[in-house]
Amino acid sequence: MSNSSARPESLSEYLAHLPLSDEQRAELARCTSFSELHQHLAAQPAASTTEAAQASVGPRLTVGSAAELEEAEMLGVDASGRLCLKIAPPIKRTKVVPEPWRTNVLIRMWRRMTGRTNAPQPPKRELPPARWRTVGSIRRYILLTLMIGQTLVAGWYMKGILPYQGWSFVDFDEIVHQPLWDTVVQVWPYALQTSILVLFGILFCWVSAGFWTALMGFLELLTGRDKYKISGSSAGNEPIAPEARTALVMPICNEDVPRVFAGLRATFESVAASGNLDRFDFFVLSDTNDTDIAVAEQQAWLDVCREAKGFGRIFYRRRRRRVKRKSGNLDDFCRRWGGEYKYMVVLDADSVMSGECLSSLVRLMEANPDAGIIQTGPKASGMDTLYARLQQFATRVYGPLFTAGLHFWQLGESHYWGHNAIIRMKPFIEHCALAPLPGKGAFAGAILSHDFVEAALMRRAGWGVWIAYDLPGSYEELPPNLLDELKRDRRWCHGNLMNFRLFLVKGMHPVHRAVFLTGVMSYLSAPLWFLFLVLSTALLATNTLMEPQYFIEPFQLYPLWPQWHPEKAIALFSTTIVLLFLPKLLSVILIWAKGATEFGGRVKVTLSMLLEMLFSMLLAPVRMIFHTRFVLAAFLGWAATWNSPQRDDDSTPWSEAVRRHGPQTLLGIAWASLVAWLNPSFLWWLAPIVGSLVLSIPVSVISSRVRLGLAARDEKLFLIPEEYATPPELLATDQYTHENRWHALHDGFVRAVVDPRQNALACAMATARHGQAAPIEALRAERVAKALEVGPKGLDGNTRLALLSDPVALSRLHEQVWAEHNTAWIDVWRASIDNDPHSPLLPLHPENVAQPALA
């Protein structure tokens, strides 16, 4: 629609949202149409009236801040002469080709037998001989011996506890010729008992692995004599070579924008304070598909660049073609800019790292040319709910033992957790691109948990993967409540189950095959434990309801009594308790030895440990049920999504807790009732399980409260060193988060369409810079017409994304919304500003300014 037929509207409302001088505003107020206004702003006639708003993007963006952007050389033009912001470096493409997976051993054997070769692979290097490789192999054989030996002894004790002592009294020849029901009655107790024994062995071996890992970590940290730790190989604070350029990349997707950019700014300023800023570039790699959040990201990027003087160092890229999730996001970065950097540090959306930590990682890479990945041990901090503070305390107190223990057993063939780690770019690009898993179904397609796979591929290519467990200055945040943690666990569960398909892929190192196995067991142990408990209940029912057979052979003189050995039961129970809880006690002993002041003192840290143990006992059965559901959902192909409602202060509403935990509560009540009916004395053994399920709703809600978390901190309970003496990076993150929330941009897409400056920023940062081809123009016209017709509330997500990515369509929509006075858009924009208590105090309806009608 042309401006000549547009509805009259006030220019002053539009001009009020541009930071103009009184003289500029008075001059522009004489315009008679919005097309004329944009041409005056652009100081040149537009090629056509439809392009007037596009021509004024530059002046609308730079008014009041032109010198700042020009000094940083941030302004440029695209191939069509449209203004754009230099939000990313020039693209210098590098070839990134993922190797197709061949997960089927039989197919590989058949191809070899028939003389067909597999697809050529990138050349791999042999990891040079080193003493640590021999030591690591010996240590892992010792660990395997300890685990198997301990499990065999425990299994022997468990066999002695169970009432039916083996299959020796079952005559297999007889059961073949007797009626089926008699066979079932005779075999059922022994089958149950054997199944219980097998499950017990698997679960006990899993617990044993954790125990020996924590024990060796305790000894490593207590003595401090780890001669193989990677952090001891650097010469100290030597200058970083100019060619050792490092990219800090932060992949994000629909994240909390104020917190993301607060952590990024704190990290950036810490690197600047270290004096090594010229060796680092920062990239925010967005996969966000929520247009409101995407616009908020754009504004936050501009703000952090202005406030931290980060123009030319902090870059932003939002993908329009979102494939392969996070691994695809990183692939895209490597393909565009990876060849320009020697190293890459991957950050999570909640990561914060100190400049000294980052500089140390680069120095360690330089000092260890055979290292492909060096993973730090991030410290959890920054959350205030009771649940989060309990988890922060647990990871801060017990976590170092397990991290140091992992390093002890794995050395240079270790874990990579996907963030807060440095990666050598060249081998990563050549060997760690991830192809989709072949086939169909829930365990095919894009790899979800990319980190373990990338570490395995890096080691397969001949590069070491290390954990710098003692390197300070690496931080992360934990979920604020149980349900948010379980939401994350569902994705991790599906990803780890998918990764197990790579267990037999050719060339994988045995350690990383074990990593795939432990990743599966992290979640598969839950249904195994649940099945163990169900079978134990079934065995109880069998002993209670079925008439025992004391004489099972013809002419048997003496009855065969079920056996019970309480001394073995007590010994096995005590051993299991030691394996489960001794690592926690050792952690506190280590704190006593090293100094407990930062944890609130010896008494407080001990009391905190006891309370955390009680809390973990309450939560373990709840997690067991949820993880069992997640495993079943993955095998059944259910989508791994869980849309939780918005919550105030990250707390869990009672309604959501009832919906999520209600079935568990009913299960706990029914289970307890059944056991009480069968054998009330057995209920005492099952009480920790069913009691936790019954109490899951109030525990989930109460633990999510910030007030209780802060009260515990006031009492020095669950205190961690980062709360006792907060590092400057975390102080800065907290400060910037509060500032960002105060000025947070809401209803971003509506503002990008209607607001003069927000529209200019969105147009300048848009990436779909197509030419004037007829099909493209037709599509643009269709999208603009649809947006004007249905308004912001009726516009679907794909159309929103397409408009936000296209500077031409977005500027045309902006001009026509104002020219036609489209109330569907303008009223929502006004309401957004009215509802924003921290928006600039600009008049929406200026009364003292002349209201020229636009023809």
Curated annotation (Swiss-Prot):
It is a multi-pass membrane protein. It comes from Pseudomonas entomophila (strain L48). Involved in the biosynthesis of osmoregulated periplasmic glucans (OPGs). InterPro entries: Glucans_biosynth_gluTrFase_H, Glyco_trans_2-like, Glycosyltr_2/OpgH_subfam, Nucleotide-diphossugar_trans. GO terms for biological process: glucan biosynthetic process. GO terms for molecular function: hexosyltransferase activity. The chain crosses the membrane at residues 142-162, 196-216, 515-535, 572-592, 606-626, 682-702. Its EC number is 2.4.1.-. Pathway: Glycan metabolism; osmoregulated periplasmic glucan (OPG) biosynthesis. The keyword Transmembrane applies. This is Glucans biosynthesis glucosyltransferase H. Keywords: Cell inner membrane, Cell membrane, Glycosyltransferase, Membrane, Transferase, Transmembrane, Transmembrane helix. It is found in: Cell inner membrane. PANTHER family: CELLULOSE SYNTHASE CATALYTIC SUBUNIT A [UDP-FORMING], GLUCANS BIOSYNTHESIS GLUCOSYLTRANSFERASE H. Pfam families: Glycos_transf_2. Belongs to the glycosyltransferase 2 family. OpgH subfamily. It is an enzyme of class 2 (transferase). Signal peptide: none annotated. The lineage of its organism: Bacteria, Pseudomonadati, Pseudomonadota, Gammaproteobacteria, Pseudomonadales. GO terms for cellular component: plasma membrane.
